[in-house]
Amino acid sequence: MKLRFLFAFLALTLLPATLPAQTAETSGKPFVVEYYYKAKWGYADEFLQLFKKNHYPLLKKQVEMGRMLKVWMDQPRYHTTEDGRWDYRVTIVFKNSTVANEPFDEDAIKKQLWPDQATYLKEEQRRFELLLSHWDLPVRTMDLEGK
């Protein structure tokens, strides 16, 4: 019993000391997130049109600001099973993990890019109504030549 308390005490006191070192090590490197979109059958083109009109300009603005380094979209060349199907994958390379995870106020940019907020909000709602699912996947590149 005493050994368990000692272990818990050591874990709680030593663990926080290792976290800043890990964060500092990775915070300077680009941070990549893949965003997957699976549209309802027959609505992928409408989703893409709304994405390009109402979301891509916001992403491009963040690239211009330096928050993101690069943004691109991929589409599968061939079909797959329904459970594994996705229609679009947007890959965003953030400047670093800190920038990717800290709060960012997009509202001012949205109001600048889309002064007619009522139309913008209606179209954004429609864009998400067209989806069956959407998921985000942070990824890291593996060095196959290293250890």
Spans of model-derived segments:
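Bacterial N-terminal signal peptides
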Residues: 7-17
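Primarily extracytoplasmic ectodomains and periplasmic/lumenal surface modules that are beta-strand-rich
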Residues: 41-46, 98-100
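A cross-kingdom feature marking solvent-exposed beta-strand/loop segments within repeated
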Residues: 75-79
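Acidic/histidine-rich, surface-exposed loop or edge segments in extracytoplasmic proteins
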Residues: 27-42
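Boundary of Sec targeting at the N-terminus
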Residues: 21-22
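An amphipathic, aromatic/His-enriched active-site/gating alpha helix that lines ligand/cofactor pockets
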Residues: 26, 61-69, 83-85, 91-141
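Bacterial N-terminal signal peptides that target proteins for export
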Residues: 1-7
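Short amphipathic alpha-helical segments
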Residues: 43-70
